[in-house]
């Protein structure tokens, strides 16, 4: 078995865990490699280009927060991904640092279960396709002279056209990310839906809408000038021209996250979003 390891190199705790993990793997003669950035930060010569990892590795380990897991999952190509939470929030990273060894034991022995998560696929007019686990984000861009109008079609039927700072299309997994911050609903992970969430719309009647994930969404920006950022999981991938149409639908590829059977979704929401009746006192 061979592992691909991604590390949040800005966190000393993640780097420390990476060193402990490699010692654990070496002691068991289990092969591993890092992505180039992680290897450089650790001074390790065992690395491969990110695009090659899925061909040579059997499983992926993300040491960091949800951002590190998103990066690892982008290159996993449906290989199992185990997330060790060294971040602040950790909706996706299933295991704490103390649980890492149990998770690794289960992964090596094959005694683990999987949470399968849907992805989004955005196709440009050029034919290029991009994928994301959390969301596809259309933004107005800094050069726009006036608030642009975003036109949305569902299965080629007009849903609406309205002025806003942007539009988020999120999976159920991504509903607790940017979409939630923009006023979108929280959606249970196994729900077969997407949510379309406007960012600061210039109209009180414009609200997020939940749609079936078998729908095809087409979005264009109605503006006379400017370039408009297209982001996948928060990372800018393209600048769109005015009127350029992007087609978004469910990707045929999915992400397999190694499940922590001790985690309960309601408990996660209570803890991460402070929904408990017990609130910090500041003492």
From Swiss-Prot:
It is found in: Cytoplasm. NAD(+) binds at residues 66-67, 134-135, 145, 163, 165, 176-181. Keywords: ATP-binding, Cytoplasm, Kinase, NAD, NADP, Nucleotide-binding, Transferase. It holds the Pfam family NAD_kinase. One of its GO terms (biological process) is NADP biosynthetic process. Its cofactor is a divalent metal cation. It catalyses: NAD(+) + ATP = ADP + NADP(+) + H(+). Its main location: cytoplasm. Involved in the regulation of the intracellular balance of NAD and NADP, and is a key enzyme in the biosynthesis of NADP. Catalyzes specifically the phosphorylation on 2'-hydroxyl of the adenosine moiety of NAD to yield NADP. Belongs to the NAD kinase family. This is NAD kinase.
């Amino acid at each position: 078995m061979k592992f691909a390891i991604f590390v949040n190199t800005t966190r000393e705790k993640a780097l420390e865990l990476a060193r402990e993990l490699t010692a654990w793997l070496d002691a068991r003669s289990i092969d591993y490699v890092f992505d180039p950035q992680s290897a450089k930060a650790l001074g390790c010569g065992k690395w491969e280009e990110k695009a090659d990892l899925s061909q040579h590795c059997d499983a992926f380990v993300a040491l960091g927060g949800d951002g590190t897991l998103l990066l690892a999952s982008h290159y996993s190509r449906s290989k199992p991904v185990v997330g060790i939470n060294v971040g602040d929030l950790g909706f996706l990273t299933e295991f704490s640092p103390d649980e890492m060894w149990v998770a690794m034991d289960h992964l090596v022995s094959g005694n683990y279960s999987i949470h399968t998560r849907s992805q989004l696929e955005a196709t440009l007019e050029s034919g290029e396709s991009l994928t994301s686990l959390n969301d596809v984000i259309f933004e107005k861009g800094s050069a726009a002279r006036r608030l642009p109008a975003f036109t949305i079609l569902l299965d080629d039927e007009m849903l609406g056209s309205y002025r806003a700072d942007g539009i988020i299309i999120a999976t159920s997994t991504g509903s607790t990310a940017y979409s939630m911050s923009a006023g979108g609903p929280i959606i249970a992970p196994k729900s077969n839906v997407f949510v379309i969430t406007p960012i600061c719309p210039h109209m009180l009647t414009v609200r997020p809408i939940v749609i079936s994930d078998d729908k095809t969404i087409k979005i264009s920006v109605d503006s006379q000038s400017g370039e408009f950022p297209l982001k996948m999981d928060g990372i800018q991938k393209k600048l769109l021209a005015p009127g350029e149409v992007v087609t978004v639908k469910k990707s045929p590829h999915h992400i397999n996250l190694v499940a922590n059977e001790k985690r309960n979704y309601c408990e996660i929401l209570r803890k991460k979003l402070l929904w408990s009746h017990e609130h910090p006192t500041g003492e």
